[in-house]
Amino acid sequence: MATIVVAMSGGVDSSAVAAMLHEQGHHVIGITLQLYDYGIAVGKKNACCAGKDIYDAKMVANKLGIPHYVLDYENKFKESVIDNFVNSYLHGETPLPCVQCNKLVKFRDLINTAKELGADKLATGHYVRKINGYNGAELHTGLDAAKDQSYFLFTITREQLEYLIFPLGGFTKYETRKLASKFGLDVADKPDSQDICFVPDGNYKTVINKIRPEASTSGKIVHINGFELGEHSGIINYTIGQRRGLGIAYNEPLYVVKIDPSNNIVYVGQESALHVHEFIIKDVNWLADEIKDNEKLAVDVKIRSTRPPCHAEISKLCNDKIKVQFLSAEKAVAPGQACVIYAGERVLGGGWITRNIR
């Protein structure tokens, strides 16, 4: 049997993984990362990093009789994730902090810690599958499409993927809860996390204004045809595709279509102005063979975790960025979000949306 470290968040998924591996006879070690000021977050029920989650993880470990460690990563989390989140909004982007956390904190440091403990593998409760392919490990979507989390894991490296295991990849959420109940875990009916862990009340603007008070500097709201319509209360209050809360009167519905942080301008226009045919992604991470120069590849892409994949064609640009061309125009492609590239159920890679070419 193997020594396996389980990343325990205190939720039902990772708790079920720890119990399952323990029952199989593996030597299981639980690790929970303290990422935020839990004194503030205590009592928050819908975020993955609330203080009670550490307690829940510890209680599960005690019930199973496995060692459990809590690692304090608050400073690194602030520098790598929270500051990035704030800066992204100030640059007119719509950030995705959970992916940055996976890349810069969770997987990198958990894998290093697991290896220091002599573990053979690191297990998580993500709903994705690792499949041994001809050229090594491949990342595939979870069998439960409603819970698939592959979109959030595109930044892991091939080397990291070889070391990781995802025992819930073939499970549905119902089956996971049933398994946790079978093991008598108190977290079996615990609600799923919803909020960003460092946004206690779901209002990210409060967090940004606390760190960067200048974020609420007012500016102009301008129609894409060039005329001024009103004043905004800070670009952090707006995201691409937004319709509600613009505070301007017009004879037809208007949407945020562009944010210009350099000039502190929010541009609005009709819904048709949101349609995008192609865009550029940067900082691409490949979990399959990288696309070649002058090659065009037909793929599926996801531009939001909640959206279904859509058909596209990708090609490599001279600066190692990737151009993504939709077969049919898509709405509200937001810079700062991730674009994950698929071939069927396999994750080929992904990158960060940097700009749109309408």
Swiss-Prot record:
* InterPro entries per the UniProt record, alphabetical: MnmA-like, MnmA-like_C, MnmA-like_central, MnmA-like_central_sf, Rossmann-like_a/b/a_fold
Gene Ontology molecular function terms on file: ATP binding; tRNA binding; tRNA-uridine 2-sulfurtransferase activity
Q: Where is the active site?
A: 101 (nucleophile), 197 (cysteine persulfide intermediate)
Which reaction(s) does the protein catalyse, per the Swiss-Prot or TrEMBL entry? S-sulfanyl-L-cysteinyl-[protein] + uridine(34) in tRNA + AH2 + ATP = 2-thiouridine(34) in tRNA + L-cysteinyl-[protein] + A + AMP + diphosphate + H(+)
All disulfide bonds of the chain are 101-197
- Tell me the organism: Rickettsia typhi (strain ATCC VR-144 / Wilmington)
Q: Name one Pfam family in it.
A: tRNA_Me_trans_C
Q: Where is this region: Interaction with tRNA?
A: 147-149
Protein name in the entry: tRNA-specific 2-thiouridylase MnmA
The record's family statement is: Belongs to the MnmA/TRMU family.
Indicate the annotated site residue(s) for Interaction with tRNA.
126, 337
| Any one of the GO BP annotations | tRNA wobble position uridine thiolation
**Organismal lineage:** Bacteria, Pseudomonadati, Pseudomonadota, Alphaproteobacteria, Rickettsiales
Localization annotation: Cytoplasm
* Keyword Cell membrane part of the UniProt annotation: no
Which residues are noted in the entry as ATP-binding?
7-14, 33, 125
Task: State whether keyword RNA-binding applies.
Answer: yes
